[in-house]
């Protein structure tokens, strides 16, 4: 058995993949080398791609043996055999969905070279499992040895990992909402919800980077598992040399990689490509099962399987498959009950196309196929497209049982592309490793199947890519929205057809492309998308600089601005009749910068207020049909596995922003509800002051078996709370999306499952981090050594120099600390640290610097200035912080208008705004001359030693110096409020000539002008 070859020379071979093994060494074609960096991350070299795949499987078995065993059991539906009764629900679903059978089918249809490559990976897994299991204490805990992997096992792992990824159980929730609240409320709760997984990703062209080459960065958001769902790895052979984030159990690098020539990343497209069909089933006299299809009753495939349960009796599950797909809910015995036999069944018998009218289908957009009518026409003549397996094919069987209803019992089947087509997209994986350009990558992705992703990519030759990849079937739009009747041919898939996949210009004129699961490129393919806040915020942050570097990307990864707080805080601002404590709470939250920072007690207060509002909404009569005793979560009609999608309180929490703005409740009721919550939260805060957000907002990862108490050998301080469940910043709709369940818990299980920065200038300047470490073995030095870095947003370097790596198949014993430059990121934006657009020393006053306004970082400062009584002529005295921020975001978006802070010796002293009069409403009030240049001034109060004589005139000297340093500017225009006598007198004193009064919508102003000649005379 060939395992690995330890290198005798750490620096042997070149850095590129073309010299993976030195020419003067004779090595077996099966041989490989395992190197590790200081973080235990494996770097693998082999003589060819097959040996490299074997190496990848082998090292994954060493590092993640228990994780691989867990995944193998999950795809087979045998988890309960070692984890007990709590795993039965999953096992039952996997058996009924026939995931293992689908994996076998898809493996059988792989290209021969791909099948050999996957087989080599499996050989490596089997080679390494015994040693890996000897290191992993979990095997002893459950008294099991690892099971052997089959060639098709990786495909099954991929299926089981992603089968719930597209969120088909949400269709069950929509049916419940339609039945209980009405058809027009079906999409009331539409938003990024309990079962979805998303990501951030962004691409910067060279015009926005310090190196002049593209940067690609982001972070996938998934349920965080320990060990992690991503594995940092490097794969090198003569054909390629790739770094990236692999999925343990899957060969190659599917989602995030850098080949040296091209880098790519993905986010969930939020597409809908899995359908649920309402089936009618009946038992035959010989014990078989019949299903009702478009052509009448026919014999369906049916067999039974046994689920072994540790510590309990085994269970028997009946596996049924119709022409649509495997039955996952209900059966011929009627166990689905009233949920589909009663009113809901009646709703499904009606005109489903009507769900697209009257607003409930507004999220579907222009779906492929030319609307539901075109899809209906196309589907009616097509066959079902599935291969339900043995026992199908229309055999009438033994006829209906005398005790069975002639109409049949209700059930639900699942139809998804791999089961129908026998393709899972694994032929793409080796092609990704060999890609050298965006064109190579694009061609490979044409064969991608699932999950359906949005892809960003860039190469070193200047190419870029922004597209959707995956298989979305062509069928009626309504299939995406709800459960549809199996016997009606109108709802069939168009056999052999796939929806066209959108693509767009990779990088726009601003040099920025963003993907964050929003309703954007993939809008025609889905129903529910993430709110736009993350995408907007990322664009805002990236647009603020043109010198981005890999290290600076962490500033974006860790941004905590919570834009979705606006509706709730707006209602709080106007909540009537608050008591003193609630007034103090309101004042505090309205002054809050809306950043969910770990050290913020205001963030905690906001979270408490949000939770209380969620529960009050859940108790409101408007939602009583889906809450309390009527909560679909309590229904016995559906398997317990689907309860996260059916629980009302989390649905309300995730959709709170829209529920507080749509017409669900009258405005007065919303105000009263928020006022009541404010009183309750304020009273609690008076009694128990809030803790910092990071003390409550802790990671709660999923683990098949909990860790043993830490003794500090894993690199932690011995504290399980901090080593396993660190407190971090962020929230559901922040760029730093650490998502708890609003209204249920502040703990979070979904968040950045990795972070990456791919540098197209120098791959060795790329960076990455995962929540835990390279090793899944408790007690290893690299089990959780990246957790502190991940928690604070730091990244570790991607090492590409073989000479800096450790040639071993074992983890290095020591983990040297990172340098400060490697482990820290830039702090918050401080005005004094920003690059100045103008700097001028004013004699007797100090140095005046003009720096751009950062609307988010400066909002407290600006709001404080513009709402003071002395600034009443500025016209923003009653504005909220959010309104002030939005105004200056808008100003910053205009090429003709700019806002600056004037700093006197580093201290903010004034707000200085400039504009081009012919691009401003003031230009309509007078005859604009060539060279006119408008300014607005708001001087901050000077206190203490700063209150020197001539303070304002000194600042004006610097402002005028800035304006007239451009020879194209011939005249300064100001327009103070006509009532502001002090400002007018000041302008005259420094040389302005008064012009006429003008009437603007917000004020009557007096124009004043300062020519270049007059300014020179003053100088």
Segments and roles (model prediction):
Residues 889, 893-944:
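Acetyl-CoA-dependent GNAT
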Residues 973-984, 1001:
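Conserved beta-strand-loop-alpha-helix junction that forms the acyl-donor binding cleft
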Residues 947-962, 985, 989:
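Conserved acetyl-CoA-binding loop-helix of GNAT-fold acetyltransferases
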Residues 818-856, 1017-1019:
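Conserved N-terminal entry element of GNAT/NAT acetyltransferase domains
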Residues 963-976:
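Conserved GNAT acetyl-CoA-binding A-motif
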Residues 916-918, 975, 993-1007:
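Conserved catalytic-core motifs of GNAT/GCN5-like acyltransferases
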Residues 2-342, 346, 350, 377, ...:
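C-terminal/peripheral segments of proteins
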Residues 931, 1000-1019:
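C-terminal "cap" of GNAT-fold acetyltransferases
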């Amino acid at each position: 058995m060939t395992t690995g070859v330890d290198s005798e020379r750490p620096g042997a071979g070149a850095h590129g993949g073309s010299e993976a093994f030195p020419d003067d060494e004779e090595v077996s074609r099966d041989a490989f080398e395992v190197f590790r960096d200081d973080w235990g991350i494996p770097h693998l070299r082999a003589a060819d791609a097959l040996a490299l795949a074997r190496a990848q499987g082998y090292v994954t078995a060493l590092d993640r043996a228990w994780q691989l065993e867990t995944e193998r059991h999950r795809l087979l539906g045998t988890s309960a055999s070692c984890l007990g009764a709590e795993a039965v629900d999953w096992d039952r679903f996997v058996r009924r969905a026939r995931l293992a059978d689908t994996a076998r089918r898809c493996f059988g249809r792989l290209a021969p070279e791909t099948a050999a490559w996957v087989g080599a990976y499996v050989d490596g897994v089997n080679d390494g499992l015994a040693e890996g299991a000897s290191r992993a204490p979990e095997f002893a805990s459950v008294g099991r040895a690892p099971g052997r992997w089959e060639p098709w096992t990786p495909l099954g792992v991929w299926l089981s990992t992603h089968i719930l990824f597209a969120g088909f159980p949400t269709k069950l929730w929509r049916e419940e909402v339609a039945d209980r609240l009405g058809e027009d409320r079906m999409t009331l709760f539409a938003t990024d919800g309990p079962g979805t997984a998303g990501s951030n990703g962004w691409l910067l062209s060279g015009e926005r980077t310090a190196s002049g080459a593209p940067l690609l960065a982001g972070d996938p958001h998934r349920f965080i598992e320990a060990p992690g769902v991503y594995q940092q790895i490097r794969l090198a052979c003569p054909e390629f040399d790739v770094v990236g984030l692999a999925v343990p159990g899957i060969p190659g690098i599917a989602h995030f990689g850098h080949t040296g020539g091209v880098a790519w990343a993905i986010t969930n497209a939020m597409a809908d490509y899995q359908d649920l069909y309402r089936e009618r089933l009946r038992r035959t006299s010989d014990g078989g099962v019949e299903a009702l299809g478009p052509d009448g009753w026919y014999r369906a495939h049916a067999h039974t399987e046994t689920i072994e349960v540790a510590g309990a009796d085994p269970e028997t599950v009946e596996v049924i498959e119709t022409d649509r797909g495997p039955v996952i809910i209900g059966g011929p015995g009627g166990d689905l009950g009233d949920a589909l036999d009663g009113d809901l069944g009646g709703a499904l018998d009606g005109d489903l196309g009507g769900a697209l009218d009257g607003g409930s289908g507004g999220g579907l957009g222009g779906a492929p196929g030319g609307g539901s009518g075109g899809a209906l026409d196309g589907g009616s003549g097509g066959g079902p497209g599935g291969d339900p397996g043995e026992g199908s094919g229309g055999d009438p069987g033994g006829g209906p049982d005398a005790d069975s209803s002639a109409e049949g019992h209700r059930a639900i089947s699942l139809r998804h592309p791999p089961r129908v087509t026998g393709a899972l997209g694994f032929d793409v994986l080796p092609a990704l490793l060999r890609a050298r350009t965006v064109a190579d990558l694009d061609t490979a992705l044409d064969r991608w199947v699932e999950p359906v992703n949005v892809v960003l990519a860039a190469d070193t030759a200047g190419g870029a890519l922004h597209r959707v990849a995956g298989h979305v079937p062509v069928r009626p739009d309504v299939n995406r929205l709800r459960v549809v009747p199996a016997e009606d041919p109108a709802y069939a898939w168009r056999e052999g057809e796939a929806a066209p996949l959108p693509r767009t210009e990779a990088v726009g004129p601003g040099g920025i492309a963003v993907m964050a699961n929003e309703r954007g490129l993939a809008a025609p393919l889905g129903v529910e998308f993430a709110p736009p806040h993350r995408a907007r915020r990322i664009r805002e942050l990236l647009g603020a600089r043109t010198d981005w570097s890999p290290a600076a990307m962490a500033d974006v990864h860790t941004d905590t601005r919570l834009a979705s707080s606006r509706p709730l805080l707006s209602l709080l601002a106007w909540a009537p009749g608050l008591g003193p404590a609630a007034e103090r709470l309101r004042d505090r939250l309205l002054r809050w910068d809306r950043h969910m920072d770990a050290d913020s007690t205001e963030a905690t207060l906001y979270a408490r207020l949000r939770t209380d509002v969620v529960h009050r909404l859940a108790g409101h009569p408007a939602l009583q049909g889906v809450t309390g005793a009527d909560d679909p979560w309590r229904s016995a009609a559906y398997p317990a596995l689907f309860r996260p999608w059916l629980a009302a309180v989390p649905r309300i929490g995730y959709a709170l922003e829209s529920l507080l703005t749509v017409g669900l409740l009258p405005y007065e009721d919303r105000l009263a509800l928020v006022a009541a919550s404010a009183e309750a939260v304020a009273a609690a805060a008076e009694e128990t002051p809030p803790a910092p957000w990071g003390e409550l907002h802790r990671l709660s990862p999923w683990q098949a078996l909990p860790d043993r108490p830490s003794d500090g050998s894993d690199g932690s301080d011995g504290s399980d709370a901090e080593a396993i469940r660190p407190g971090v910043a962020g929230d559901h709709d922040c760029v730093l999306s650490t998502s708890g369940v609003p209204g249920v818990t502040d703990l979070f299980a979904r968040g950045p499952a990795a972070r990456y920065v791919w540098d197209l200038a120098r791959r060795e300047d790329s960076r990455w981090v995962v929540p835990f470490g390279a090793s899944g073995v408790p007690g290893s030095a690299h089990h959780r050594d990246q957790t502190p870095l991940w928690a604070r947003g730091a990244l570790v370097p991607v090492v590409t120099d073989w000479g800096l790596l450790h040639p071993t198949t074992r983890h290095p014993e020591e983990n040297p600390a990172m340098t400060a430059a490697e482990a820290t990121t830039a702090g918050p934006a401080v005005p004094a640290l920003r690059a100045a657009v103008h700097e001028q020393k004013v004699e007797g006053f100090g140095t005046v610097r003009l720096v751009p306004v950062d609307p988010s970082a400066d909002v407290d400062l600006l709001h404080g200035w513009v709402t003071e009584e002395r600034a009443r002529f500025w016209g923003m005295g009653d504005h909220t912080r959010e309104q002030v921020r939005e105004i200056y975001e808008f100003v910053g978006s205009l090429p003709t208008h700019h806002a600056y802070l004037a700093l006197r010796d580093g201290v903010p002293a004034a707000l200085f705004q400039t504009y081009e009069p012919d691009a401003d409403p003031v230009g309509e009030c007078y005859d604009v001359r060539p060279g006119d240049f408008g300014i607005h001034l708001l001087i901050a109060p000077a206190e203490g030693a700063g209150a020197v004589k001539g303070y304002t005139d000194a600042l004006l000297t610097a402002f005028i110096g800035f304006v007239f340093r451009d020879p194209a500017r011939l005249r300064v225009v100001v327009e103070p409020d006509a009532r502001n006598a002090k400002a007018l007198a000041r302008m005259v004193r420094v040389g302005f000539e008064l012009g006429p009064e003008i009437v603007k919508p917000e004020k009557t102003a007096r124009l004043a002008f300062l020519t270049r000649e007059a300014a020179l005379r003053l100088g």
